[in-house]
Amino acid sequence: MASAEAAFEPRFLETRDGVRLRAGLWNAAEGIPFRGVCLVLQGHSEFLEKYFEVFDELRGRGFAVAAFDWRGQGGSARALEDSRKAHIIDFAQYAEDLRAFMDQIVRHMDDRPPFALAHSMGGHILLRNLHDHPGIIRAAAFSAPMLRVFTNPFPENLAIRIARWMVRFGRGNDYVFGAGKRDPIALPFAQNIVTSDPVRYARTIAHLEADPSLCLAGPTWHWLSAAFASMAITAEPGYAEAITAPVMIATAGHDRVVRTEATIAFAQRMPHCFHGMVEGAEHEILMEQDRFRALFWQAFDDFIARALPGT
């Protein structure tokens, strides 16, 4: 089969509130029993090109792949004149992105509900979807979902209050402290906190160098305040218990972006959740060294065999 990179032909769709999203679709590998569609939901500041390797690994497992860039990142439309700002008013807008993609594209690919693989922020949005719309997704695998985040150098409660204050005082469209000076292309590998794999890190940077429009410098106060508000929703009593879909959650043993202990506690409350820790891995497990990725894919394959029997 042609690689996901070679076969990539961008598609575009529009949400109900008029936002243009970039998407991609890939067929499953030939000669392998077809398992259905796998929806891949990327994390904050990511883009389709970063996941070409993951797409091919899913295709080799019998899945057709459907993925898109969230509004405000990748090749999708930006809300502000400064295209390097990650900006959102409410995470319900991300839910609209997912709804539009499911309705306009995914539901036409297969008669059965899709499977889903989601990372970090994408995992957070998917968990809210599983809670609010049971049955739309057959089963889901998560890589380090965003349920609580590190807020260094501030305590979490203070960071939440600061974000609210900045929005209240008309600074919601400004970068959070220090973000405007960030240049992801110039960040040395040794200073990154998301992967310990220099080859995959360099590949991500190469995509950004080839198309700088994919770059984000950092979030606005509106984005951060909306993220805190959404995480407060998933932390409500009974929320995890109400998610009944079969779920696999992989957490990273050396995560410095999301708080692993919060994810584990959430997973333990879900009625049909398998949790596994990838010891030593940084936040982006799927962009990690082969030895860490192998642990994820072994757990994924075992989960698929149980969650989607006969496919």
Regions found by a protein language model. Give the residues of each.
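N-terminal cap/lid segment of alpha/beta-hydrolase-fold proteins
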Residues: 1-30
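Short alpha-helix in the alpha/beta-hydrolase fold that links the catalytic acid
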Residues: 245, 259-268
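Active-site glycine-rich loops that stabilize anionic/oxyanionic intermediates
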Residues: 35, 41-46
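Catalytic active-site module of serine/aspartate enzymes centered on a nucleophile-bearing elbow/loop
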Residues: 274, 279-311
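Alpha/beta-hydrolase active-site loop
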Residues: 86-106
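Short beta-strand/loop motif that positions the catalytic acidic residue
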Residues: 243, 249-251, 255
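Alpha/beta-hydrolase-fold enzymes
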Residues: 127-215
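Conserved alpha/beta-hydrolase
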Residues: 48, 55-81
